[in-house]
Amino acid sequence: MPDAIEVRKVPIHSVADASELAKLIDDGVMQAERVIAIIGKTEGNGGVNDYTRIIADRAFREVLVEKGAPAEQVKQVPIVWSGGTDGVISPHATIFATVPPEDLTGALAPSDEQRLTVGFAMSERLAPEDIGRTAMITKVADAVKVAMERAGISDPADVHYVQTKTPLLTIHTIRDAKSRGKTVWTEHTHESMDLSNGCTALGIAVALGEIEMPSDEDVMHDRSLYSSVASCSSGVELDQAQVVVVGNAPGVGGRYRIGHSVMKDALDQDGIWEAIKDAGLDLPERPRTSDLDGRLVNVFLKCEASQDGLVRGRRNAMLDDSDVHWHRQIKSCVGGVTAAVTGDPAVFVSVSAAHQGPDGGGPVAAIVDLG
């Protein structure tokens, strides 16, 4: 049985700041060697050349080592950064750590009640020619199943959030594929971000039984195929799929629980509230921010501009805008909607949601404190 989880959200005060992680460790909230995953937002451009993700990654790993975690162990900790804090979104990190068994007393002791659990896995290496094709779907699906097993989850219905980081295509990797006589799905590096995310989401959906195995032709074209729990990011930092499965399991113990839902479109506040309720908070029929009473740890969303250029029947110009890419516009929009619900702009809102939730909407996961 996996260990119980402690999870906290902390602000990031500057690009290279990890002082709040250090404070959590110094205050005894968690131990450096027990940190198992970090998921956060950095303030870069969110694109191919967003190096704030690399800077933040280094800062957080250095703190873990400074506070006593073995360097080799720290190298293996999955740290997923989503670049781009457009609009009111505030840079932050959500940190997951295991709890020593001796600390699980009273209401926190393991029981039949489902509580938060986390599992991690890495896929086989993803070659540039795999990205956007069924080879990638298969490799991701295999890694998701391993992460589920490590989280102690046997029923896919108990998986509420799968956060991934996968490689996108760069000029260098495209050149590499061609030198070996291979082709790539696209030679547009920015488009490959959407491609990598979408293909990864299909792998998650296959692993969890949400869809049957799609064909190469379905990738990015059949938007009726999607996962309701996938949250996929991509970058230049790695050549494998990094998979973090977050769900609930009995017998784990602890004080936290996770739930999920989907936003049907960019304005669907109800979808966010449904995820919070699904996590276990008892809320009124028409809840307000004040009803959360400090019990919401964080929400995690993916968003996407609807392919028809409409929101609730009204036309918008995001997909035609040559000045500001639609990635930044929809992220800013949904970030504002989300912060209005939670009352906190430190929310994980990430763009590029192909095959992640319905077209124009996206998955929502919420972690709450039931302690």
Swiss-Prot record:
Q: Mind listing the GO molecular function terms for this protein?
A: barbiturase activity; metal ion binding
What is the designated name of this protein? Barbiturase 1
Q: Where are the active-site residues found?
A: K165, S233 (nucleophile)
Q: Which organism is it from?
A: Nocardioides sp. (strain ATCC BAA-499 / JS614)
Q: Which domain of life is it from?
A: Bacteria
Catalytic activity, EC:
3.5.2.1
- What phylogenetic lineage does the species belong to? Bacteria, Bacillati, Actinomycetota, Actinomycetes, Propionibacteriales
Q: What does this protein do?
A: Responsible for the hydrolysis of barbituric acid (2,4,6-trihydroxy-1,3-pyrimidine), an intermediate in the oxidative catabolism of pyrimidines. Catalyzes the hydrolytic opening of the pyrimidine ring of barbituric acid to yield ureidomalonic acid.
Specify where the region named RU B lies, as residue ranges.
Answer: 115-250
Classification via InterPro entries: AtzD/Barbiturase (IPR014086), AtzD/Barbiturase_RUA (IPR043008), AtzD/Barbiturase_RUB (IPR043006), AtzD/Barbiturase_RUC (IPR043007)
